[in-house]
Amino acid sequence: MLSSTTLLAILSALALTSVQAAPADKNSLDYLANKAGKRYLGTAVQSPQLVPGSQYVQILESQFDAITPENEMKWEVVEPTEGNFDFTGTDKIVAEAKKTGSLLRGHNICWDSQLRYAHEVAPKMKLCINDYNIETVNAKSQAMAKVAAGLLAKGAPLHCIGMFKNAKRRSSGLLIRTASSGLESHFIGGSTPKDIPAAMNLFSDQGLEVPMTELDVRIPVNGNDMPANATVAKEQVDDYYTSVSACLGNDLCPGVSIWQFADPTSWIPGVFKGKLIAVSCTFSGCLLQYCVGYGAALLYDAQYQPKSTYYVVQQALKDGKNSGSKFHGIKL
């Protein structure tokens, strides 16, 4: 029989754990999300970052009430070689979620035949399809909507589509849930789709939840991982407001998960580095020309201090369903 930890490692889900938490900070992101009618405001984490008493953990526990393992529940980590399982990182993240009463989102399994097997093992689990480039109305999102409709018509246990793009922490018994599709939502500043609500409706109109599962907004940066200029910084703020507002405007969007929350822990600088694109030489020497890399995508800076992106997410949550799609400035 599979252990509960094994189930969490192989099933894509939201788990509600049994813990009574301390009184909430009424300006924290999770409190404001709950007050706005959302189930959670979450983030991705990696187990080595869970150092007791660290700035990272203090922010995690004070601002977020849902956790997604960034890598620890992926197949190649859980079962690095066939038949050999390692739940070390998974167990550490599960323990953190239990300690704080946070929701735990399993990330991820393969689909679609696994939906039925997962449902048989854990019938209370909500199961989601999580994909990228479906945050706008395009050929892929429309095709995914047809896939979802086909699965539902066949009786598949599909509950949500994730786009990878109550005012207190929970205190009830263990509840493992899904029925949705995930919108990943990895955006580039200034290029965030304006039709996210319409894309969400492709799935929510079928009764599927539409969580925003991996939100970040990368922008061009200088050598210090700071915004390259004021224009891109402003675009990034607008894009965070637009994204969070899209979730707030859809009753079947249960919440938003930021893909990590502090720039030093983001995956983006390691992938979208600046590159040498030209070399021009004269008798006096050579000029190297680099393209700008991307980074500064999250809510906290390298010193774990909140940035303008944090405050705009906070403001969008305060504005709630009346936020609209355009940010008009932070209300002090």
UniProtKB/Swiss-Prot annotation:
Residue intervals of the GH10 domain: 26-316
Biological process per Gene Ontology, one example term: xylan catabolic process
Localisation: Secreted
Domain of life of the native organism: Eukaryota
Primary location recorded for the protein, binned into one broad class: secreted
Function as written in the Swiss-Prot or TrEMBL entry: Requires at least three xylose residues for catalytic activity. Does not have activity against xylobiose.
PANTHER family attached to this UniProt entry: BETA-XYLANASE (PTHR31490:SF88), GLYCOSYL HYDROLASE (PTHR31490)
The protein's name in its UniProt record: Endo-1,4-beta-xylanase
